[in-house]
Amino acid sequence: MKGQSMILKDLAAELEEVVSPINLDCEEEIETEEVDCPAPFAVEAVCHVCEQVLRLAVVASPDGILQLQQLLLTDSLSFLCTSCSREAFCNRRPQRNGS
């Protein structure tokens, strides 16, 4: 250090003046907002290939569940079990987004 020689006691006193302690135990309360967390829905479907029963849990709005139900009932969406999925994608890269 250049200038006056300082001792640890002086340094601590200087730092104490610069850093004023803040009381973190104040009586202030923050209002908490409750977030609506939709309940999960149980979906049962069958594998498109082997017809094994598949059980899924999904979280969606009531409109989303209705849309999923319509997709499943019109055969425009089908699921594969893990075994059939592995067999379908064995030795090739899965196509993405229908391409």
UniProtKB/Swiss-Prot annotation:
Which terms in the Gene Ontology molecular function aspect does this entry carry? DNA binding; DNA-binding transcription factor activity; protein domain specific binding; zinc ion binding
Give residue ranges of zinc fingers (unnamed). 47-84
What processing steps or modifications follow its translation?
Highly phosphorylated.
Lineage: superkingdom: Viruses
Q: Where is this region: E7 terminal domain?
A: 1-37
User: Would I find NAD among this entry's keywords?
Assistant: no
Find motif (Nuclear export signal) and give its ranges.
65-73
Got a GO cellular component term for this one?
Answer: host cell cytoplasm
Q: Residue numbers of motif LXCXE motif?
A: 24-28
Q: Which GO terms describe its biological process?
A: DNA-templated transcription; symbiont-mediated perturbation of host cell cycle G1/S transition checkpoint; symbiont-mediated suppression of host innate immune response; symbiont-mediated suppression of host type I interferon-mediated signaling pathway
Q: Which keywords, in A-to-Z order, does the entry hold?
A: Activator, DNA-binding, Early protein, G1/S host cell cycle checkpoint dysregulation by virus, Host cytoplasm, Host nucleus, Host-virus interaction, Inhibition of host innate immune response by virus, Inhibition of host interferon signaling pathway by virus, Interferon antiviral system evasion, Metal-binding, Modulation of host cell cycle by virus, Oncogene, Transcription, Transcription regulation, Viral immunoevasion, Zinc, Zinc-finger
Subcellular compartments: Host cytoplasm; Host nucleus
Which HAMAP family does the UniProt record give? PPV_E7 (MF_04004)
What does it do? Plays a role in viral genome replication by driving entry of quiescent cells into the cell cycle. Stimulation of progression from G1 to S phase allows the virus to efficiently use the cellular DNA replicating machinery to achieve viral genome replication. E7 protein has both transforming and trans-activating activities. Induces the disassembly of the E2F1 transcription factor from RB1, with subsequent transcriptional activation of E2F1-regulated S-phase genes. Interferes with host histone deacetylation mediated by HDAC1 and HDAC2, leading to transcription activation.
User: What family is it from?
Assistant: Belongs to the papillomaviridae E7 protein family.
- UniProt note: domains: The E7 terminal domain is an intrinsically disordered domain, whose flexibility and conformational transitions confer target adaptability to the oncoprotein. It allows adaptation to a variety of protein targets and exposes the PEST degradation sequence that regulates its turnover in the cell.
Subunit architecture:
Homodimer. Homooligomer. Interacts with host RB1; this interaction induces dissociation of RB1-E2F1 complex thereby disrupting RB1 activity. Interacts with host EP300; this interaction represses EP300 transcriptional activity. Interacts with protein E2; this interaction inhibits E7 oncogenic activity. Interacts with host TMEM173/STING; this interaction impairs the ability of TMEM173/STING to sense cytosolic DNA and promote the production of type I interferon (IFN-alpha and IFN-beta).
Question: What is the protein's given name?
Answer: Protein E7
Give the source species: Bos taurus papillomavirus 6 (Bovine papillomavirus 6)
Which gene is annotated as encoding this protein in its UniProt record?
E7
